[in-house]
Each structure stands twice: as C-alpha cells, then as structure tokens.
C-alpha cells in the first residue's frame, strides 16, 4: 500500500540498498551475457572532492543514459573511480599535518609522507563516492578504480616508456606556469586569471651610441610593462617590421637600464604598432609570448628568479654574461629579494636615473594559482614533455572524419582550434604524491627509462660496465644491494601530471595493458559526458592516447554540457556567496527533484540558471506522481496479466494509449539524441497534463460509476499507463519510480532492470547496423549476435485523439478566456458551437457533462453563426463562442487590458534602451545583460497575449 505522503528521505536509502543487494548495476550480469554492451567512463572526481553542482549535473546526465540503456536490454558498464589529484591531495595532507602540529612533509621525508597520504585516502577518500550514490548514480561500484591503483600505475609506466622509446616523450627547457608557493609547475587549468588594479610602467631604454637624455626622445626607445622586475632578464626590444618609426633602428642595440646589458632591436610581428609606443621588451625566460619571439630570433633565455619567486642574479651566469664590471654591483644589492619587493626597488632606481617615463593605472588580468592563491610566474625550467603535436594528428583526423562527434557540434571548432595549435605538454610536477616518473639517472646524467626499477638498474649497470665506468663485480654488488648503488643511480624525483593518468582512463580501467575480456567488450566506450572546460585537458588527451595505444577512438560521441549558474546567471563561487550545495537540496527536496531539475534545464549549449524554486517545483511534480498512483490504488486499478492496451474499446482509453505511446517515443528519441531537456519536458507534460489533469479527470465518472466492461478496461488502462510512466521517468527520477513500482503491483524484479516502455531493446536503425556487422565480421563476439527483433509499428488512434483532443482543447480555451477576463468560478457561461460539423455536434453531446463540469459552462447550444457580444474561440478549425454580454463589462475590461499593454510596452522600451547602450552591454556582468534580454522577451510575450485578448474583445463588442 502506498503511504499517504511522499517523503523522499524515507525511501532513498532503502531503495539504494535494494539496488545494491540485487547487484542491479553490475556489468556482465549472467542474463545479459549476449546483450549488446554499452559503456561510459565517469570523469573521475578528485579523491579530495565533495559533490558540487557541476558533478550533480554531469552524473545525472550519465545516469539517465545508463539507466535508459540498461532498461533497453543492454549490458551496461558505467565505470566509476576517483582521481588521485596530485596537488589537491598533497595540500590537504600537509594542512592536516600542520593542524595537528606534526612534522612537515619535508621533515617527514618522502616515504613516510606518502604513507600518510595513503592513510588519509583510506580514511577520507570515499566521501564523494558516497555522495554520488546519494544522487542515485547507477555505476558498477564493484569495479571502482583509483588512478594510483596498482593496475593503473602499471599502465601509466608502460605508456611513459613506450612514448619515450618512440621519441614522443623527452626532456626540455621551456616555460611553464610556476607556483612559487607550492614549488611546482602547474597546468593551465590550475591557473585562475584574476582582474587586478595595477600599473603600466613606461620605461626608457637608451639607444647604444647615443648620449641618453630624458628630454631627447631620439636617444631612447620607450617600452611598457606590468612587471618591471622582469626587465633584469630582457634580451631584446621588438618592433613591428612595418613600423616606419623604428625601421632605421632594427639591427641596432639598446643598453638595458640598471643592468648594462647590450640587447638587440629586432623586427617581429608580435609587436603591435597601435599599442603604446609600438616597441616591446622581450624577456624569453619570463613570458610565454616572449619565449616564442626569443626562439625565432635565437635570443638568450635569462632566468632571473629562483623557485620561490626571489631575484637570483648574483651568481647567475646567464644574467652576468657580457655585463660591464660596474653593473654587477646592482646584482648584489637586489639578489635574494622577493619579486614584489624587487619591483619597488627597480622602479625607484629607474626613476632616480631618468629611465621612468610615466606610470599609468592599469586594470589587467593576472594569473594566480587556484589552490595556492599566489601570482604564477612563467618560469624557465627543465621538465618532461609529450610531443602533443604528433599525437594530435590522428585525433584531429578522427573528429574531421566523423569517427568521433561532439554534441553540440559547435564544440568541434574549439577542439580543432586548440589541437591545431597545440604546444608540447609538460607532464612533470615537482610533487611527491602521484606517479613517480619512471626515469633513473646515472652519475653522468644519462637517463634510463624503464617500467620497473629492476629493469632500469639492469640497463644502467650494463651500460656503465660497457663504458668501463664500473667493473662487472661492482655492477653485481650494486644490483644485489640497493645501498651500494645509492648516489650512483638515482630516480627522477618528479611525478607525472594528474592528467597523464586520466588520459588513459577509458582503457586502463578495463585492465590494459593486459588483454582482458572487459577491454575487448567495453572499449571503445559509447559516449563521454563532460564539461567544456576540460575539452583540452582531458577529452583531447584521451583521444590521443586511445588512438595511439588502442588504435581506436575512446568514444564515438562527446556530449558537452553547460555550466550550472545561480538563478541570475552568475557563475557560482565561494567569494560571491552564491554556491548552491546539491546535498542541501537533496536533503530538502529529494534526489529525484534535483535530478529532474538539472535534466529539464540541460538544453544543449545553454547554461543552467538554477533557482531552488525550480527544484521545489519538481518536488511538487514528484508529489503529483505519488498522488496519482495513490488514486489508481484507491480505485482498484490493476492491469491483468497479458493486458493488451491496443485492444481497448473505450475512446478515452484508446486516446490515453495513443498519447502514452507518443510520449514514450518523444522521450526515447530525445534521450537518444542527448536532448535531455526535451525528454524531461515530454515526460513532465505527459504525466502532469495528459495523464493526471485530463485522463484521470475524464476517467473519474467511469471509475466511480457502476461495475462493467468500461470500468474494468479503464482500471486496467490506468494501471498500464501508470507503469509506462514509471518506466519513462525512471532514468530521471529513479528513487520514487522504483518505490512506486514495488508497491503498486506484484513485480518480478526491480524497475531498474525492467524492459523499457514499448520501444524495448535498441533502435531499428541500430538493429540493422549490428546485424550487418554480425553477418560480415567473423570476429564478432556473442554480444554482436544478440540482435533484438525489429520493433512493431507505433500504436496510434487518430479518431480517439481527434475526439478527446477536441474536448481538451475546448475546455483549455474556455478556461483561458475566463481567466483572462476575470470571470469568477461561480459564474457559468453559455457555450455556442457555431457552424459545427456533425462530428463536433456528436462529440459535444457525448462529452457535454464533462465540458460543463470542467469548463464551468451552463447551456451548450448549436447555431449557424456566433451570436453578437460573444468571444469567439477557434478550436481545431471550428468556432466556439462564449456569449459574455452581461457577464463581462467590455469597456472596463478593455481599459484594464490597455493599461496592462502600456506597462508591457514600457518594459520593452526600458529593456531595449539598456540593450542598445553599448557601454552597458560591454561593461555589465554577463548575467545582468542576459537578465535584461529575458525581461524584454517576457514583456514581448506579455504584449502579444494582451493584443490577442483585446482583439477578442473587439470582435465580441
């Protein structure tokens, strides 16, 4: 029996246990051994993480797909797991050590510290997994993976070694994003651009051979910088080759102020003649653009900072090279000072000597570490790199050929732009937590790359014996006793970028490099669901690695979902205080309400503006479903075994069968094409409007009437349609539907494993494709041979739809006019059907009691034409008239509507004035501009509705 009130908290934990006990989500269930496989890999959340709204959206959409395909009979693997999250995890544990006043990471040493990290992971690393379960994620939790599991670590080592052997991994000195607090290189994704009110310092660089005079512009070139401290590392001044002001100076030199270094004036298109003086200082070791200019002109790379962001020039051979003796004194003065302290010293000294032309206030974006919060430095250092350009070519070709497609398609352009301009990928990090790079160094710096230490040591010792650096006896002793080779062979201390192991996720989680049955069955996966912000960092790299090591794309479809913003459209952030916690929403409204909200708002390419009122609204929808099922139960609605909905005799029941089949088709096609919002809308509209508001309402007289064939059939149809509803809603609202499935009738099993509504199995098109593959591919596995029967044609009953649809449309139109004209419910209005066809007359007679009750209509009459003073409604091509003379004061109603029209027009004018203001559009926050657009659209819609009402009044009077 169904409880009187719907309380999600009472059912969610119980339903979760039922799924777990039945191993409902386990891939490779015995009864699905021959089913068509369907697989998705979860974007692994950080092991340090907790569920945020982005996770909630991403995993809700994946779960909709997995539950949908599982109900269609497929063998579904939704592969779960977590990422070791190098920096984040190391910081969490270091913070814990500090809070507990324990020895620091460095005092503890690497081995002991890593033990503590693993201990923390065991104690606290499963938080987000449990939160995903609360959301209802139907992953195969028995297969949960971690990016530092033994098997995945072996895959990482093998990939590194293979790519190194192929010349696609190498060591190089290049610029990286350097975090002076965490003392490591970080990825672009870990860099946050923050708007800062700073300055632009305009500096005078004296031209060699001329006497410097601040009053004589011909004696110097002006350059501008936001980072004056980096001038210590300048190695050129660049001007545009087309800039006639400087043509005569190209090839000459300037003398770097304070430093005394002689640096060339080079011609390069990087310099923009329209910006500032048109000349720019070039610091190859401290600016990414300057680094490229430096390569083009073979300029020296002079690093003037140490790893902590302090000036390092006193013993810096690159800095000191070629400097006059007198200039070295300044190096001693400034050496060891913090970069921002040095900035003040340098600016003051430049001003003292007349080298500072002006200081200009300047608001600009400054890169900060998203975890450390400090300003990031472009820093020249030795790191390990992947030749991403070579690996990118097959990945570009796969998307160009359509082997992998993006949904929405416009994201392919973003993918191509990045891939076609891809830079070497820095994969080393100066951390302790992560996959330690499998490279060992000999005493002369020679590198030995191998999957295991044993192999690397063997290779190294063999090499040095051959080179006669050590004897065979020494080599034997070193091989046997690690202590004897200490200092002779040392391992690279760096670890790999977290994204390196994540790039292998689609195949490493399936057992690669071993040739496992799971790898053969579930790779490639069917779709990747992810956010646009990691197209470069994760999607592109999985494409590269999948094609290189598996010789196949990791997924044929990439679905890119949008951002979840606050209700005004602003990006959620802790600093703004507008972060909405999904767990709080689950506690208050239930997981199903949150899931349905996210799905209903997940229109392709459009960010979600999340308001708690929407979640509350869908909680009400869940309550509506609950109450509809209680109504069916209280009226004894049960579908007997073998019930055939297509054999229904009653027009109303044939209509609901027609509408149910249509709703199933709409939901199915929308999910298949990743139109989650359309699928949710179709389900919502059918359940609330068609089934609850109309079918159950129209069926009440039968259900409450005398026993007979009509009542028996209606009870069965109410139950059948209810079950179809539970099926199409299950991917969106799994908890409530599973509960109602269990309590509404005796069942053979869980709804999660029940067959999908009518269109069971897979699409007709897919059936034909699989059949063709099975017929032509001798290697086709059992899954390929499990071809479902072709689908039967959709059930339709156009006559039933025409009849009941007319009743619904007529009542809806009358209700709309009554509301529009403020007619009180107690006032019954007459209805005249003007020039009605014989079919319409017959329908009106059959359904007169229903029309009168639901539309608050008194007498229903028929006439050749609409009477004077009647509001005319067009219902399915025929006129229905409401004689309202004496019921409505037409003049007063017209005055009211005209007043409303004036307000709507004023709102339109106000919004359009703002949107026409270029300064407003350019400077206001994106969400504020979008809000004005929405105000305009709402006012325009209101105006159209009022004009329609005025036209009706005019025609009536």
UniProtKB/Swiss-Prot annotation:
Span(s) of short sequence motif 'HIGH' region: 45-55
GO biological process: valyl-tRNA aminoacylation
CDD domains found in the cross-reference section: Anticodon_Ia_Val, ValRS_core
Catalytic activity field: tRNA(Val) + L-valine + ATP = L-valyl-tRNA(Val) + AMP + diphosphate
GO terms under cellular component: cytosol
Molecular-function GO term, any one: ATP binding
Residues forming coiled coils: 887-946
Entries under PANTHER family matching the protein: VALINE--TRNA LIGASE, CHLOROPLASTIC_MITOCHONDRIAL 2 (PTHR11946:SF93), VALYL-TRNA SYNTHETASES (PTHR11946)
Annotated family: Belongs to the class-I aminoacyl-tRNA synthetase family. ValS type 1 subfamily.
Cited function: Catalyzes the attachment of valine to tRNA(Val). As ValRS can inadvertently accommodate and process structurally similar amino acids such as threonine, to avoid such errors, it has a 'posttransfer' editing activity that hydrolyzes mischarged Thr-tRNA(Val) in a tRNA-dependent manner.
Designated name of the protein: Valine--tRNA ligase
Species of the source: Rhodopseudomonas palustris (strain ATCC BAA-98 / CGA009)
Gene: valS
């Amino acid at each position: 029996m169904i409880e009187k009130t719907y309380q999600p908290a009472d059912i969610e934990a119980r339903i979760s246990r039922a799924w777990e006990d039945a191993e409902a989500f386990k891939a490779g269930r015995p009864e699905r051994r021959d089913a068509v496989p369907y697989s998705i890999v979860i974007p692994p959340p950080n092991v340090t993480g907790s569920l945020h709204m982005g996770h909630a959206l991403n995993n809700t959409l994946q779960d909709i797909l997995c539950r949908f395909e599982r109900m269609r009979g497929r063998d579904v693997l939704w592969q779960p797991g977590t990422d070791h999250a190098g920096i984040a995890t190391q910081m969490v544990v270091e913070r814990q050590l500090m809070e507990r006043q324990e020895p620091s990471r460095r005092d503890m040493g690497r081995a002991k510290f890593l033990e503590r990290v693993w201990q923390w992971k065991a104690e606290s690393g499963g938080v987000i997994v449990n939160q995903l379960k609360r959301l209802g994620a139907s992953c195969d939790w028995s297969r949960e993976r971690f990016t530092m599991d033994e098997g995945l670590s072996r895959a990482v080592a093998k990939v590194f070694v293979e790519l190194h052997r192929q010349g696609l991994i190498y060591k190089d000195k290049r610029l990286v994003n350097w975090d002076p607090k965490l003392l490591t290189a970080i990825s672009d994704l870990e860099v946050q651009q923050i708007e800062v009110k700073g300055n632009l310092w305009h500096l005078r660089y004296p031209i060699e051979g001329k006497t410097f005079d601040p009053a004589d512009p011909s004696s110097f070139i002006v350059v501008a910088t936001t980072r004056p401290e980096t001038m210590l590392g300048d190695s050129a001044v660049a001007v545009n080759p087309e800039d006639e002001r400087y043509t005569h100076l190209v090839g000459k030199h300037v003398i770097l102020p304070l430093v005394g270094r002689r640096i060339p004036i080079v011609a390069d298109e990087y310099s923009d003649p329209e910006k500032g003086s048109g000349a720019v200082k070039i610091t190859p070791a401290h600016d990414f653009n300057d680094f490229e200019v430096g390569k083009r002109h073979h300029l020296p790379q002079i690093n003037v900072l140490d790893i902590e962001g302090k000036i390092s020039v006193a013993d810096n051979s690159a800095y000191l090279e070629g400097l006059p003796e007198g200039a070295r004194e300044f190096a001693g003065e400034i050496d060891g000072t913090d970069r921002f302290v040095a900035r003040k010293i340098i600016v003051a000294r430049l001003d003292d000597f007349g080298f500072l032309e002006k200081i200009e206030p300047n608001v600009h974006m400054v890169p900060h570490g998203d975890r450390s919060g400090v300003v990031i430095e472009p820093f020249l250092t030795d790191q390990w790199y992947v030749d991403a350009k070579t690996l990118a070519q097959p990945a570009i070709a796969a998307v160009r050929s359509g082997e992998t497609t993006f949904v929405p398609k416009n994201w392919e352009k973003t993918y191509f732009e990045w891939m076609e301009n891809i830079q070497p990928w820095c994969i080393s990090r100066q951390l302790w937590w992560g996959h330690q790079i499998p490279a060992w160094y000999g005493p002369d710096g020679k590198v030995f790359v191998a999957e295991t230490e044993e192999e690397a040591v063997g290779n190294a010792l063999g090499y040095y014996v051959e080179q006669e650096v050590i004897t065979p006896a020494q080599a034997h002793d070193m091989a046997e006793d690690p202590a004897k080779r200490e200092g002779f062979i040392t391992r690279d201390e760096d670890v790999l970028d977290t994204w390196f192991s994540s790039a292998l996720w689609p195949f490493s989680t399936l057992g690669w490099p071993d040739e496992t049955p799971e790898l053969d069955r579930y790779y490639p996966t069917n779709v990747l669901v992810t956010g646009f912000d990691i197209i470069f960092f994760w999607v592109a790299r999985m494409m590269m690695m999948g094609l290189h090591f598996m010789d196949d794309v990791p997924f044929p479809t990439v679905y890119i979902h949008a951002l979840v913003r606050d209700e005004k459209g602003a990006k959620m952030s802790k600093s703004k205080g507008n972060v909405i916690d999904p767990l709080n929403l689950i506690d208050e409204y239930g997981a199903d309400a949150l899931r349905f909200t996210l799905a209903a708002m997940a229109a392709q390419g459009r960010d979600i503006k999340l308001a708690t009122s929407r979640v509350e609204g869908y909680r009400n929808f869940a309550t509506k479903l609950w109450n509809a099922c209680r109504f069916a139960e209280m009226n004894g609605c049960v579908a007997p075994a073998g019930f055939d909905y297509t054999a229904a005799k009653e027009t109303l029941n044939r209509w609901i069968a027609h509408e149910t089949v249509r709703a199933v088709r709409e939901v199915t096609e929308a999910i298949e094409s990743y139109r989650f919002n359309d699928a949710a809308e179709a389900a919502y509209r059918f359940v609330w409007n068609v089934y609850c508001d109309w079918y159950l309402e129209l069926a009440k007289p039968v259900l409450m009437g005398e026993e007979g064939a009509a009542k028996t059939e209606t009870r069965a149809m109410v139950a059948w349609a209810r079950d179809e509803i539970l099926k199409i809603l299950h991917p969106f609202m799994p908890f409530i539907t599973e509960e109602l499935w269990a309590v509404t009738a005796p069942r053979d099993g869980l709804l999660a494993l029940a067959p999908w509504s009518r269109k069971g199995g897979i699409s007709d098109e897919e059936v034909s494709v699989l059949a063709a593959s099975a017929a032509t591919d001798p290697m086709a596995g059992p899954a390929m041979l499990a071809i479902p029967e072709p689908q039967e044609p959709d059930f339709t009953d156009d006559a039933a739809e025409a009849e009941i649809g007319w009743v619904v449309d007529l009542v809806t139109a009358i209700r709309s006019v009554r509301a529009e004209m403020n007619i009180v419910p107690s006032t019954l209005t007459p209805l005249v059907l003007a020039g009605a066809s014989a079919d319409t007359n017959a329908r009106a007679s059959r359904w007169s009691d229903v029309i009168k009750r639901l539309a608050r209509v008194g007498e229903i009459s028929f006439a050749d034409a609409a009477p004077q003073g009647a509001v005319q409604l067009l219902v399915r091509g025929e006129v229905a008239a409401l004689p309202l003379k004496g019921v409505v004061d037409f003049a007063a109603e017209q005055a009211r509507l005209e007043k409303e029209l004036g307000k709507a027009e004023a709102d339109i004018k106000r919004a359009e004035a703002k949107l026409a203001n270029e300064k407003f559009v350019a400077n206001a926050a994106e969400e504020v501009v979008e809000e004005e657009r929405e105000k305009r659209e709402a006012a325009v819609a209101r105006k159209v509705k009022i004009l329609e009402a005025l036209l009706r009044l005019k025609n009536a009077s």
